[in-house]
Regions:
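Basic/polar low-complexity intrinsically disordered segments
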Residues: 4-27, 249-250, 292-293, 299-305, ...
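Assembly/oligomerization interface modules of large self-assembling protein complexes
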Residues: 6-74
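Short conserved micro-motifs at the rims of enzyme active sites and ligand-binding pockets
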Residues: 28-30, 190-191, 269-272, 314-318
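Long, contiguous amphipathic alpha-helices that act as assembly "spine/axial" helices in icosahedral shell
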Residues: 54-137, 156, 160-161, 165-186, ...
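Contiguous, function-dense segments enriched for cysteine-driven chemistry
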Residues: 128-167, 192-195, 200, 210-233, ...
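Extended oligomerization regions of viral-like shell subunits
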Residues: 171-271
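C-terminal structured domain segments
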Residues: 249-312
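Single conserved hydrophobic/aromatic residue that forms the stacking wall/gate
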Residues: 320-330
């Protein structure tokens, strides 16, 4: 949902985000004698943001270098240089995975809340400033509220999702995917009306549910359902991460549902300026990731840092509608 294009990596401290509404206007009928009628370009908004800085690092000491590494044979026959190279690759992989999880969190928060709050840290425990990014003025209109919970009497899962699709369609925006939290997904599998509509003997074909794992951790493709002509790919999301308190947290709420479409946003990156190892001048890099090596020869230590300045931004105003349609199961 948030790919990075060639124009999304900036060689600047700030990035420019552009987003606009959909287009539902009609072309006018024109008298041949008039020639043509000029039309204005769709209005759009441009905002400048300074992306937050992400920079995990890992220190390699002489003591760690002489220890047997994780997964290493008991008598490996590795010398210090070989072990250091292996540790370097492992450290780089660990830091890349942590940054990728943070980017996933930013994308999820932006889809859910039309923005996100990025809490800076001075060190591993001390909080710094909170950076707030909002892609709307005043109040956001991206939320749809179900009149009744779907798993309570009077709930209308099919009607509410169709209404969400029509809200997007009325603005000239696509509706392709239905993303569900685990509680909502479990409810749909037990919903009697859904079972009846999926019965091929009924003569009304509304889709098929055939669950299968996807290439993404914690994401299940449930099938395709037809909501008043809107054919939606249905996904269940159960992916979690470890938050700052050490507790497990969900990227997507268990009781939430969202109608959206691929390519609804993009991941942008600001530049990073640093003094590289062995250099005396500063260099500015426009890249997704920027590595830096710091060597302290006096203490026989080496530190590897992986820097990143990402910003998840929507491409279209009010593209995403999210609801909390089910009561949490005990």
């Amino acid at each position: 949902y948030f790919p990075t294009g060639a124009g999304d990596i900036f060689k600047a401290n700030e990035v420019l985000t552009e987003y606009r509404s959909g287009d539902r206007k009609l072309a006018a009928f024109v008298d041949q004698k008039a020639g043509d009628i000029p039309i204005g370009r769709r209005s759009y908004e441009v905002h400048s943001y300074k992306p937050a800085y992400i920079a995990p690092s890992r220190l390699l000491t002489l003591d760690e270098l002489t220890k047997r590494g994780f997964g290493e044979a008991l008598y490996p026959g590795m010398d210090e240089a070989q072990r250091a190279a292996r540790l370097l690759a492992d450290d780089m992989n660990d830091m890349e995975n942590r940054i990728a999880r943070r980017e996933e969190w930013m994308a999820a928060e932006t889809m859910i809340g039309n923005g996100c709050v990025m809490q800076e840290y001075i060190d591993g425990a001390t909080k710094g400033d909170s950076l707030v990014v909002k892609f709307y003025d005043g109040t956001s209109d991206h939320t749809y509220t179900a009149s009744k919970k779907w798993n309570e009497n009077g709930g209308d899962f099919w009607g509410d999702v169709k209404a969400m699709c029509r809200m997007l369609s009325a603005r000239g925006l696509p509706a392709k995917d239905l993303i569900l939290g685990t509680d909502v997904a479990d409810y749909i599998l037990t919903d009697e009306r859904t079972r009846q509509l999926l019965d091929k003997n009924s003569g009304i074909i509304v889709g098929e549910i055939r669950q299968q794992l996807t290439q993404y951790d914690g994401v299940v493709f449930m099938g395709t359902l037809n909501f008043g002509g809107f054919m939606l790919n249905v996904f269940s999301v159960d992916e979690t991460y470890e938050d700052e308190t050490g507790k497990s947290a969900r990227y997507f709420p268990a009781t939430a549902a969202m109608v959206t479409a691929p390519d609804c946003g993009h991941m942008m990156y600001g530049s990073i300026t640093q003094m590289d190892y062995g250099k005396t001048d500063y260099t500015t890099y426009a890249a997704k990731r920027v590595a830096k090596l710091v060597v302290d020869q006096d203490k026989d230590t080496r530190k590897l840092r992986l820097g990143c300045r990402p910003l998840a931004a929507p491409k279209t105003l009010s593209l995403i509608h999210i609801s909390e349609p089910t009561r949490r199961t005990p």
